[in-house]
């Protein structure tokens, strides 16, 4: 899901002008997110995967972030509340920082530069947990798997509204 491209020095800025801020960057803030979502019908999961909106959130982390936020991945961006936006900002940073500390997620073949597997997959709340019980206390929902933008999407059918 990546690519390698060689740029002339002057072409580099054109490329980065079309890439959104990283979620750990201060530019990924409440005002930025709010302004991006105004009148947008696209679902929130698609936005989190859109590198023009925010760079660096992949499919696994988008599902996990939305679970922590208690947001249904099919919810349209224009219907996202200010509280939802605060949660998206907060939990994007939280999930990604946890994943970094755990060395990433090794599902099949991911290894770090020293050849070690990541360990964040042991922390998954929804990703690859289809038909299992939700891990939130007092939630009796089941984890569902559906597809958004041809990507597997995992969510709790009860606590993600």
Q: What residue spans do the PLM features occupy?
A:
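Structured catalytic/nucleic-acid-binding cores of DNA maintenance enzymes
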Residues: 1-161
């Amino acid at each position: 899901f990546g690519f390698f491209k060689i740029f002339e020095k002057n072409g580099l800025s054109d490329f980065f002008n079309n890439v959104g801020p990283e979620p750990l960057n201060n530019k990924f803030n409440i005002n930025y997110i709010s302004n991006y979502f105004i009148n947008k019908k696209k679902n929130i999961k698609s936005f989190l995967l859109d590198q023009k909106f925010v760079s660096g959130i992949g499919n696994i982390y988008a599902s996990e972030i939305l679970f922590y936020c208690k947001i249904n991945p099919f919810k349209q961006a224009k219907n996202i509340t200010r509280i939802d936006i605060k949660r998206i900002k907060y939990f994007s940073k939280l999930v990604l920082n946890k994943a970094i500390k755990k060395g990433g997620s090794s599902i099949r073949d991911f290894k770090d530069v020293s050849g070690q597997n990541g360990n964040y997959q042991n922390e998954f709340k929804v990703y690859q947990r289809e038909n299992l019980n939700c891990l939130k206390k007092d939630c009796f929902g089941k984890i569902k798997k559906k597809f958004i933008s041809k990507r597997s999407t995992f969510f709790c059918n009860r606590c993600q509204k």
